[in-house]
Structure formats: C-alpha cells, structure tokens
C-alpha cells in the first residue's frame, strides 16, 4: 500500500470513527485530505474500499495481539495477555478499533463475509483460551467458554468509548482480568 493510500485510509478511519460510515462522505474525506473529491478516485474505487481496508487493519491488529502470546504460558496468563493485547490495540489504534467494532455491518458481499469470518475466528481464539483453562483445571470445570469469551469481549470492545489517552492499558486489563477470571477459577465449598 502506498504512503498516500495509507494516509487516506487513516483519515477515513478517523472520520468513520467520529461520524460513522454513513455519516462520512467522500467529500468529507477529500476535504480532510486537502484534495479535490475526484482525485480520491485515483486511489480508491469507492468509499467501501476504505472501510474494508480499515476493517482488514483492525482484524490484523487484533489477531497479531493474540499471536504474540507465548504458547507455553499458563492458560489464565494467556487470557490476561489477550485482554492486555486487545486493550492495547484499542488504545494505540483507537479509530481503527472503533470502526472495527461499530461499522463492519456496512460492508457488503464477499468483503463482509471475510470480515465476519475474521471476527468469528478472533472470538473462537478467545473461547479456546477459556476452554484450555477449563481443561487444564485452571478455571472452573463448569465454565461455559462461550459465555466467558463474550463477557471478556463485551467489556473490552467498548473500551473505545471510555478509554482515556495515556491510561495504562495493562493496568486496566489486569483489573478486568481479576474481576472476570477470579470468578471463573475453581473454588471449594464447605461440605
């Protein structure tokens, strides 16, 4: 991707995050880039191209955060590191993360199918961490990994609405982790 195309995608992501995909026009993007509307079409075929590229960037960033987790780490540490990575992506790529969470519905056809598949694959990777924790007895034996993954992702995905610049995302992730996972660990009850 050329430098200009990358700048264009970043600017579109910023506007999509602020105004929504449908609230952003090609004219808005051109104005933000300081170019004529028609000149954008030398770089893109449609506004949806920019939405797709933003979505692709988001999917790649979230998957890369999971890829960085050491395979030999204990399962609960992997969950903590996944949460840290997710919040770090949100903090470092706020516009992209916002668009990835909110605007994916506006893609059409094969592009939508691809991004939905990437989102599902990410969710499955998170579920697998909880499944591993349960199977290794690091988490409760009756843990529903689907519910656990949805809870974690529901909390983490909305970070774009409240995360303040400069906040330590690892500290926030560790607090979330303590609240979420401590209730999922095994416990003993009196006989």
Question: Over which residues does each language-model region extend?
Answer:
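Helix-turn-helix
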Residues: 7, 11-49, 53
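Hydrophobic/aromatic residues within well-ordered alpha-helical segments
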Residues: 47, 54, 58, 62, ...
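Short secondary-structure transition hinges
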Residues: 49, 88-128, 161
């Amino acid at each position: 991707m050329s430098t200009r195309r990358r700048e264009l995608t970043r600017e579109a992501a910023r506007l999509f995050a602020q105004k929504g995909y449908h609230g952003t026009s090609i004219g808005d993007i051109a104005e933000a880039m300081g170019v004529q509307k028609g000149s954008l079409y030398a770089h893109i075929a449609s506004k949806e191209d920019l939405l797709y590229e933003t979505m692709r960037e988001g999917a790649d960033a979230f998957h890369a955060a999971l890829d960085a987790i050491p395979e030999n780490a204990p399962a609960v540490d992997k969950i903590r590191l996944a949460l840290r990575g997710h919040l770090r992506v949100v903090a470092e790529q706020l516009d992209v993360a916002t668009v990835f969470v909110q605007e994916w519905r506006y893609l059409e056809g094969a592009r939508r199918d691809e991004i939905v598949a990437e989102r599902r694959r990410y969710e499955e990777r998170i579920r697998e961490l909880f499944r591993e924790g349960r199977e290794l007895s690091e988490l409760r034996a009756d843990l529903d990994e689907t519910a656990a993954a949805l809870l974690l992702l529901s909390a983490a995905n909305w970070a774009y609405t409240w995360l303040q610049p400069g906040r330590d995302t690892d500290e926030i992730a560790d607090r979330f982790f303590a609240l979420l996972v401590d209730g999922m660990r095994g416990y003993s009850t009196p006989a």
